[in-house]
Amino acid sequence: MFWLLALLAYLLGSLSFAIVLSRLSGSPDPRSCGSGNAGATNMLRLAGRKMAILTLLGDLCKGLLPVMLARLAGLDLQEQAWVGVCAVLGHLFPVYFRFQGGKGVATAAGMLMGLYFPAALLAIAAWLLTFYLTRTSSLAALIATPLTLPLLAWREPAALLPISVLTVMIVWRHRNNLRDLFAGRERHF
């Protein structure tokens, strides 16, 4: 059952709401415009608030839904977390869109909502505060993502390894943003 749910999570994660919504709305493909990222932040730049909110909600749901299905199927917490990681992998490397996806932040937040809601609230609050102070989405993601690790280590240690892998994946996807942050070239809102 685990492998079936992991595969389904990857396939669901591969549905890129940014790409689909950009096509439906006649907006530019987010992979080739703006930051080049197929995610909610770039959709805000390219297609406006409504498309960005729809992208965000879709990306959150594709992280949450597989974890909830894994829970309903009776998988333990660590297996649920790995299923969620598969959804994020699908977002990062979507099979339907030549493996060119987003950075996984919203999908990871949805996954955390299903695993341990207080960790998701912590990450979202940290993201919002950092974004408010810096107006830099990538910096907000790079600060918010690892903040969940101590809380999970304390409250849900079974999820620590998958969430650690997830954190590394998200930081790796932000490697160009890190270079731009250190060089003072990162985009701000």
Swiss-Prot record:
UniProt record, GO biological process: phospholipid biosynthetic process
Assembly with partners or alone: Probably interacts with PlsX.
Name the UniProt record assigns to this protein: Glycerol-3-phosphate acyltransferase
Membrane-related topology note: Multi-pass membrane protein
A GO molecular-function annotation: acyl-phosphate glycerol-3-phosphate acyltransferase activity
Keywords of this entry: Cell inner membrane, Cell membrane, Lipid biosynthesis, Lipid metabolism, Membrane, Phospholipid biosynthesis, Phospholipid metabolism, Transferase, Transmembrane, Transmembrane helix
Source species, domain of life: Bacteria
Catalysed reaction, written as an equation: an acyl phosphate + sn-glycerol 3-phosphate = a 1-acyl-sn-glycero-3-phosphate + phosphate
InterPro entries: G3P_acylTferase_PlsY (IPR003811)
UniProt family annotation: Belongs to the PlsY family.
CC annotations in GO: plasma membrane
Listed pathway(s): Lipid metabolism; phospholipid metabolism
Pfam families assigned: G3P_acyltransf
